[in-house]
């Protein structure tokens, strides 16, 4: 679906516990009273940083649009001492998902998931698995994984216990560990995840230059506020995220920011 384009554009994404705002100035010149900065050829580092930012942002919004605070973040492992290739590990996960999907549907639910499959430096494969929670879902996951691999007990956390959606998106999309060839990043998601669509409208000039103000009942995460000129596109921008006061997502973000700051 095509949307009307504005010279100053605001895109707003609404989620259960947060609102994400992006403002962009697409004019040929700079803002009034300012000269547009000359666009420079970005470095490889800048390009990779921008690409990683976009990957993380896209996945974070997909997670927010399809999962809730008490859904499961699961670690699926193999028997101690067992070694497998990334290809074999992915095949195991595909079989596991096929079996788990049947169990969900028997109970009237659709399975939604995102997975990051890794093989560590010592060759031990494992899957970090985000999945929608249903009654007795932990038992179903354990039994299905055991049927496929013979392995025992997956470990479970709720999404807000793992730093919230922001931290999960960062972890799932982060680049591989360059310290060893066996640390491999590979993530995928189920096809039934709904892609969020933004509300698009004209942005006001004063909104582009002033520090954002939260809506009543919301808090702006200072670490999410970014304003300036994109070195790759040459466009002025302002991005920030508001979290609903009292939400588990806000608590998770504040706790995560505290750990990073410490």
Regions found by a protein language model. Give the residues of each.
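Cys/His-coordinated zinc-finger cores
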Residues: 127-131
């Amino acid at each position: 679906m095509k949307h009307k384009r504005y010279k100053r554009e605001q895109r707003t994404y609404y989620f259960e516990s947060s609102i994400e705002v992006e403002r962009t100035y697409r004019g040929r010149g700079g803002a009034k009273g300012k000269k547009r900065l000359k666009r420079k050829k970005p470095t490889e580092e800048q390009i990779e940083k921008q690409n990683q930012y976009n990957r993380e942002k896209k996945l974070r919004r997909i997670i927010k649009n399809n999962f809730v605070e008490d859904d499961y973040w699961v670690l699926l492992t193999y028997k101690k001492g067992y070694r497998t290739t990334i290809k074999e590990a992915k095949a195991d996960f595909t079989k596991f998902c096929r079996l788990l999907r049947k169990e969900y549907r028997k109970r009237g639910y659709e399975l939604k998931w995102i997975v990051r499959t890794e093989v560590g430096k010592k060759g031990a494969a494992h899957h970090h698995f985000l999945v929608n929670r249903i009654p007795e879902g932990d038992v179903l996951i354990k039994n299905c994984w055991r049927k496929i691999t013979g392995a025992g007990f997956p470990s479970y956390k709720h999404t807000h216990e793992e730093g919230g959606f922001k931290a999960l998106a960062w972890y799932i999309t982060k680049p591989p560990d360059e310290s060893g060839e066996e640390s491999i990043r590979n993530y995928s998601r189920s096809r039934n995840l709904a892609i969020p669509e933004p509300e698009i409208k004209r942005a006001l000039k004063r909104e582009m230059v002033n520090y954002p103000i939260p809506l009543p009942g919301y808090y702006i995460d200072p670490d999410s506020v970014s304003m300036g000129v994109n070195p790759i596109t040459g466009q002025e921008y302002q991005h920030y995220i508001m979290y609903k006061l009292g939400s588990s997502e806000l608590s998770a973000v504040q706790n995560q920011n505290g750990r990073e700051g410490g």
